Amino acid sequence: MMFELVLFLSVYLFSIGIYGLITSRNMVRALICLELILNSINLNLVTFSDLFDSRQLKGDIFAIFVIALAAAEAAIGLSILSSIHRNRKSTRINQSNLLNN
């Protein structure tokens, strides 16, 4: 019963993240939705690791690597966002075409 609830929560988080990533026009919102997607993947990794082999922590260790990757992605994304905001005075995705100066 708990397994199904966790998978339902993970699918729900993933769907919200995909919907937000597709429909968002703000870069900060897109980064937050990407973090939601990565967190739902982590939830799946830990759940399936516990379900199939509870003695080994392969899914948990891999989830820690994904969390570190998400932190690096957030730091790089926010620094790029800060640079674009400083130059363009906007954080909207459709106004940040850097190829047209």
Curated annotation (Swiss-Prot):
Bilayer topology term: Multi-pass membrane protein
Places the protein is found: Plastid, Chloroplast thylakoid membrane
Enzyme Commission code(s) on record: 7.1.1.-
Domain of life: Eukaryota
Record-level GO BP terms: ATP synthesis coupled electron transport; photosynthesis, light reaction
GO molecular function: oxidoreductase activity, acting on NAD(P)H, quinone or similar compound as acceptor; quinone binding
Nuclease keyword on record: no
Catalytic activity: a plastoquinone + NADH + (n+1) H(+)(in) = a plastoquinol + NAD(+) + n H(+)(out); a plastoquinone + NADPH + (n+1) H(+)(in) = a plastoquinol + NADP(+) + n H(+)(out)
Residues passing through the membrane, by range: 2-22, 32-52, 61-81
Quaternary assembly: NDH is composed of at least 16 different subunits, 5 of which are encoded in the nucleus.
Record-stated family: Belongs to the complex I subunit 4L family.
Biological role stated in the UniProt entry: NDH shuttles electrons from NAD(P)H:plastoquinone, via FMN and iron-sulfur (Fe-S) centers, to quinones in the photosynthetic chain and possibly in a chloroplast respiratory chain. The immediate electron acceptor for the enzyme in this species is believed to be plastoquinone. Couples the redox reaction to proton translocation, and thus conserves the redox energy in a proton gradient.
Protein name stated in the entry: NAD(P)H-quinone oxidoreductase subunit 4L, chloroplastic
Species lineage: Eukaryota, Viridiplantae, Streptophyta, Embryophyta, Tracheophyta
